[in-house]
């Protein structure tokens, strides 16, 4: 009923964590076996009529079953699968062997797998990357009464941009104008590849637009 109410209110994009491919593994990781069937049922039902992605973080507890977890998630009918190794496993997924059929079904998964195969760093800014976060103008992370630059910033206990109110968009624009991501340790060390690519593209397009106006 919780998800049905969200759908009635207009929510049509769901992201659900899935770090195992069976109930026993899930119990080992979470300590709760009973929640497994509920989570799987929710993913299946929501995927029938909504855009659903599952997020999988690989750690020492599940890294040996990476291929099984990805296939299991794909078979649930989700739109895409977002995989990210825990920090200590960046670019060390030697057991990664996901079929072309599954990769072609899920563009986000394919993007991340290609980055891993090509040895790209998945976290952290490089010297040629944008110093600005265009994502803050297009996305919103909220916890309680406060809004944050992004989910990562919130999880790393960064300071909120401000309170959620009628000034929220204005506050985020001010944050964007005054914030240098290279001077913020959270951004510098934790920004993900996909966010970095977005911000680099945003800066490039923004520069082109300004040139056309001259």
Feature locations, PLM:
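Radical SAM enzyme [4Fe-4S]-AdoMet core and its adjacent flexible, acidic
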Residues: 7-174, 183, 196-211
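Short, cationic low-complexity segments
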Residues: 214
């Amino acid at each position: 009923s919780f998800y049905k109410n969200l759908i009635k209110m207009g929510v049509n994009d769901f992201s659900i964590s899935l770090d195992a491919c069976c109930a026993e593994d899930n119990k080992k990781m979470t300590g709760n076996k009973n929640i497994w069937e509920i989570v799987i049922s929710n993913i299946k039902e929501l995927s029938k009529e909504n855009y659903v992605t599952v997020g999988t973080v690989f750690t020492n507890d599940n890294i040996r079953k990476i291929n099984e977890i990805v296939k299991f998630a794909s078979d649930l009918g989700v739109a895409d699968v977002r995989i990210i190794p825990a920090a200590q496993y960046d670019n060390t997924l030697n057991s990664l062997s996901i079929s072309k059929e599954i990769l072609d079904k899920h563009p986000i998964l394919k993007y991340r797998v290609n980055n891993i195969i090509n040895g790209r760093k998945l976290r952290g800014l490089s010297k040629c990357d944008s110093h600005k976060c265009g994502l803050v103008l297009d996305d919103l992370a909220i916890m309680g009464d406060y809004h944050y630059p992004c989910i990562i910033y919130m999880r790393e206990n960064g300071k909120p941009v401000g309170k959620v109110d009628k000034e929220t968009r204005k506050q985020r624009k001010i944050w964007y104008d005054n914030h240098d991501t290279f001077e913020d340790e959270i951004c510098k060390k934790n920004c993900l590849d996909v966010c970095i690519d977005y911000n680099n593209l945003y800066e490039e397009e923004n520069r082109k637009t300004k040139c056309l106006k001259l």
